[in-house]
Amino acid sequence: MIDDRKNKVLQAIIEDYVATAEPVGSRTIARKYNLGVSPATIRNEMSDLEELGYLEQPHTSAGRIPSNLGYRYYVDCLMPERPINPAEQELIRSTFQRKIRELDTLVRETARLLSETTHLTAVISGPQFEKAVFKEIRIVPLGNDRALLIYITDSGLVENQVVEVPLQVTMLELQQVAELLSEHLRGRRVETLSRTALQSLHRELSRYGTLLEQALHFLEQKLEPGDRHRLYFGGTSHMLDQPEFRDVQKLRGVLSFLEQEEAVAAVLGLDRLTEGVEIQIGEEIRLRELADCSVVTATYRVGDRIIGKMGVIGPRRMEYPKVVSILNAIASHLSEMNRLF
């Protein structure tokens, strides 16, 4: 069990290391933090914390740095709340006050904002189509025996599909197909559709032939597992600013990881959209390329349903209190904006 004095020493070491990226010695803690004890006492506490696995000593330094266990204990037990400052508040407010009419643009801007306020690499998953609820289906004639089927969802996510229109199908019948599809699908979540339900719908509307078959085949494809995640990145270049990634091999590994969207989706946990902030630190991520990184994520929603996730990727040595408060603030604003689409 860590006593109160060890807690204070560990918190001081972590916060100093986060600020300076330099190993921390007992004299530094005694001089900069009013702990009310001598450097010798602090040195003894640091030795104990190292023995317990919360600190590590780099080979080339007399100072200590936090271990993975030290960071984990900090975020679970010691991390203070840190309200976002006025400049961050104003940047967030002004971004979401802009008249953004496209969901795609909104998510891209949110990724840029998250990166700008945290100075880390930001990743946001767009609303997942299979998590969305059908709102309306429209059909727009394109000419040359083709039409555009538009699937509109409550999350603002829109899927388009170009379909071939049989020669005998009139404009009125096209509208009837759209109305019938809307009637059968409105209010239903995409992921709750089953192939059995789609086959039943096909039988019921069979007289519309190949046009309907194309629409239902499109929806069946949306039920298939695979590349379902739309990811938006911001501030990848921030990796270059971190002392941890002056090692070219480490940097190359992280940048290579960021190019693999399915791997990024897996680390963000896009298949487990659970409430709240989640922090993964170093070895907890179980990827060699991210051994020196942390990933912090939060979810956003439409109404009472979680529809997507946002997060930052950076060194383990990150300002966790700041990152958590900014993530919560931006997720809240994005959730409010989604209600407008």
Curated annotation (Swiss-Prot):
Protein name: Heat-inducible transcription repressor HrcA
Record-linked PANTHER family: HEAT-INDUCIBLE TRANSCRIPTION REPRESSOR HRCA
BP-aspect Gene Ontology terms: negative regulation of DNA-templated transcription
Function: Negative regulator of class I heat shock genes (grpE-dnaK-dnaJ and groELS operons). Prevents heat-shock induction of these operons.
The entry's keywords: Repressor, Stress response, Transcription, Transcription regulation
UniProt xrefs under InterPro entries: GAF-like_dom_sf, HrcA, HrcA_C, WH-like_DNA-bd_sf, WH_DNA-bd_sf, WHTH_transcript_rep_HrcA_IDD
An annotated Gene Ontology molecular function: DNA binding
Pfam families listed in its UniProt record: HrcA
SUPFAM superfamilies named in the record: GAF domain-like, Winged helix' DNA-binding domain
Recorded family membership: Belongs to the HrcA family.
